Amino acid sequence: MMNTSSHLKAQASCPLVEHFLRRKLSKENFDRFIPNRSAMDFDFANYALTQGRKRNVDEVTSASRKAYMTQLAEAMNQNRTRILAFRNKPKALLSSNHSDPPHQQPISVKPRRYIPQNSERVLDAPGIADDFYLNLLDWGSSNVLAIALGDTVYLWDASSGSTYKLVTIDEEEGPVTSINWTQDGLDLAIGLDNSEVQLWDCVSNRQVRTLRGGHESRVGSLAWNNHILTTGGMDGKIVNNDVRIRSSIVETYLGHTEEVCGLKWSESGKKLASGGNDNVVHIWDHRSVASSNPTRQWLHRFEEHTAAVRALAWCPFQASLLATGGGVGDGKIKFWNTHTGACLNSVETGSQVCSLLWSKSERELLSSHGFTQNQLTLWKYPSMVKMAELNGHTSRVLFMAQSPDGCTVASAAGDETLRLWNVFGEPPKTTKKAASKKYTDPFAHVNHIR
């Protein structure tokens, strides 16, 4: 038997002993492996020891059956041979929003909105003029839709569904060529073929006054900016009327050489967009319209369209963004930065662009068109990918108006129908009732007709 000194000398010179002595310092290496009973699958172990290895050696099978059995065994995990478990499965890491990599964090995907392809309601509009240069439809903030049919203006209360006639214009003054609600939805301006503009209080159903002297021919476009009523005529002039004073004409914009067929004030009331039959779009700065030099009155002049521009729409989520649409021979929707005057994008639609409306809650734009499809097209902005095409009209869709909640769109066409479309979805849910905007009553100091 080896003595103690020789035994220690042998241990010191043996590399295996030295190796095992160092392994004791490691937490990853062990000299014994004891199965973890709580992690074992005893049912499978019993099956594997008793039945799992039985094979019928005389069984004759086809190649296809062998392949099937192989796939089945893999799917059912039948060929596993490991029975003992020496460690538990690692615990799942606790999620931490601030430490997880971006690709592991859950991504909120907004479900795609369902857009009905058919109009939800169709109303008759007999006698509506099929004239690209007129504006005969408007939806007020009091949820009343106004439409001009020949010499008569009708009001449809969308809340109650009732319809009534507001006024029939005398034959020598009519027909009606434009209508536009005040911002509080209580008063209506009516432009006429004889160059006059009538102002009506629709609560009491009475005429308040008549504006004369601003134009020499029909008034085809109107736009309110609080107490200022802006009118555009076939004579190419744009006139600002302060309806609070007797001599209402306060400013005249000179720039268009042909009929003004589109007028829109920005939400702030600081800029006015005008479109004309001269294929020109002007941006006017309300703070500098009184310039003594008429050739410098406009802020910007856009001449890129190749046809009349009637469709104008200010963006609700980007104050300086304006969308414009060209008529037959152009068919383009253009986007402008009205701060710099730059054209941001131009999209070919393939047909006459009659009207444009922005969604109030989504980054979407709705356009109405003429020949060949007479459709409404919903676009995703800024990609300008088509989201939907709405068909139903059999004539060019000249007029569109948006409900106060921004969800429903009314369209009117030369086919003498008025259609309602649920194109912009449901109104956004709010926890608190939004404070309504307060507008100055434009007729606060007017108590007579002139």
Curated annotation (Swiss-Prot):
Lineage: superkingdom: Eukaryota
Cellular component terms (Gene Ontology): Cul4-RING E3 ubiquitin ligase complex; nucleus
Localization per record: Nucleus
GO molecular function: anaphase-promoting complex binding; kinase binding; ubiquitin-protein transferase activator activity
Main location: nucleus
Keyword Transport: no
Database matches in InterPro entries: Cdc20/Fizzy (IPR033010), WD40/YVTN_repeat-like_dom_sf (IPR015943), WD40_CDC20-Fz (IPR056150), WD40_repeat_CS (IPR019775), WD40_repeat_dom_sf (IPR036322), WD40_rpt (IPR001680)
WD repeats: 129-166, 171-210, 214-251, 255-294, 304-346, 348-389, 392-431
Annotated GO biological process: cell division; protein ubiquitination
Keyword Repeat belongs to the record: yes
Assembly and binders: The APC/C is composed of at least 11 subunits that stay tightly associated throughout the cell cycle. Binds to GIG1 and PYM. Part of the mitotic checkpoint complex (MCC); interacts with MAD2 and BUB1.
Family: Belongs to the WD repeat CDC20/Fizzy family.
Known role: Component of the anaphase promoting complex/cyclosome (APC/C), a cell cycle-regulated E3 ubiquitin-protein ligase complex that controls progression through mitosis and the G1 phase of the cell cycle.
Protein's recorded name: Cell division cycle 20.5, cofactor of APC complex
Native species: Arabidopsis thaliana
